[in-house]
Amino acid sequence: MKTAVILCAGQGRKMWPYGATRNKAMLPVANRPLILWQVDALTTIGVEKIVLAVDYRQEQLRSLLDHDPRIAFVSAGGCNGTAPALLAAWSTLQDPSLLLCYGDILYTAEDLRALLRLHQERRRPATALLQPLGEEKPNEWLCAQVSGDRIEQVLGHPRDSVSHRFAGVFALEKSMLPFLRANPGRMEAIQVGMMAPDEAHLEASLQIALEADHEIGAAQAGATLQDLDKPWHLLQANYAWGRHLLQSMERSNMADTAKISKRATINGYVLIGANSEIGDGVIIEGNVWIGKNSRVVQGAILEKNVIIGDHCTVRRYAQIEEGSVIGDRCFIGHCAEVAGVLMRNVYAYHYGEYWGILGEACDLGAATVCGNLRFDDGQTVHQVCGHRETPLLGANAAYLGDYVRTGVNAILMPGVKVGPYSVIGAGALVNEQVPERTLVYVQQQQIRKTWGPERYGW
């Protein structure tokens, strides 16, 4: 297949607070927008033309990719679901078959090859990439019951009776078009007592094809594939992709203009870009990737599988914990301890502890700390668009949207989310979700009395 369609039109409400300021395909994974990893994987397997179906915050995608001759854009405005968005894109093409990818999926070229191999062997109307559910709850996903290499039944957010969930990548023949057009506008393949919204899912069209006695293929995705649906999935994707990139390193790679002090302790391989420096007393405890024009100096500690972007400073005994990704132009200073994902231009200037995701241009006041261990040793239950769920990873992490600022000694309790353009004032303790564009501060009652030398007998 030489043509792929990527659906990037949705608003991504479940990804709040990060979906409030960006298209989900622009979410950063290992310091690159997700869409670039997708384009890389598609071109690796020989795809020559990629059509992006866009609507919400499409200007971000156009700014990034408009210059690329492989990329075309089609408007999916007004399309309520993946099925009509695909029809809008396919109507601009002459291809009898194509690859379809959702814009919030992180996949490898190996995932795509496994899908195409099965599809080309069987030549069914459609073949879907699927992942075993494992510990995940089926009622949080569009799911399928699988037998061998084919789908037996599609079920939307079921309680049980399924083994796999859809992984957001499909190989499709033009013979699927009648079933796309026959989509009823909501998922009718649900269990009794469940409720489906008015949204035309592609997976509903697959069930219609099954009921018309067509076979639908089921290819298995690798463990690295990630579906970025909610904030903790972004955390999980960065951890998984960092391991994918760094654990396979077999030697260090140092740019000619980079510097590594002989007084640094390095227990792993280092990929370090031009004009970057690893200084005296630095401790590196595994494989790391440091970008261009960055400084890791003055006793900073990096645990394994850490990625640091371009133009960063990590200094004065700061600690970056295992698997963390630090975006471009971040500054992490004296005794600051961070874990998770920091997007571009984040400042944690000195002292504090943070675990979770910090959105673009966040500014942490001194001694901002995150509580991530509850007294009941439990995991925080999150509300996602009215649905209560407990993430498998990152339930007790903090999630600060873009442009959030905190004052000195701010305290963020386990699982807190703060919307973009918000401020948490000095000394405030935040234990519940903060909406975007909100100022939270402490109104302190003070008692004043006279004092002086006479109090000491003078």
Task: List the predicted regions and their residue ranges.
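N-terminal nucleotide-binding beta1-loop-alpha1 segment
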Residues: 1-19, 442
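Conserved N-terminal catalytic core of the sugar/cofactor nucleotidyltransferase
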Residues: 2-6, 28, 32-101, 107, ...
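Glycine-rich phosphate-binding loop at the start of an alpha helix
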Residues: 36, 83, 87, 270, ...
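Catalytic-core segments of class I nucleotidyltransferases/pyrophosphorylases
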Residues: 99, 113, 120, 150-246
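Hydrophobic/aromatic residue at the end of a short beta strand that borders the catalytic acidic motif
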Residues: 101, 106-108, 172, 354, ...
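Conserved donor-nucleotide/metal-binding helix-loop-beta segment in metal-dependent transferases, i.e.
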Residues: 111-138
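Extended, small-residue-rich solenoid/repeat segments and analogous flexible loops
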Residues: 199-201, 207-304
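Glycine-rich hexapeptide-repeat left-handed beta-helix
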Residues: 315-458
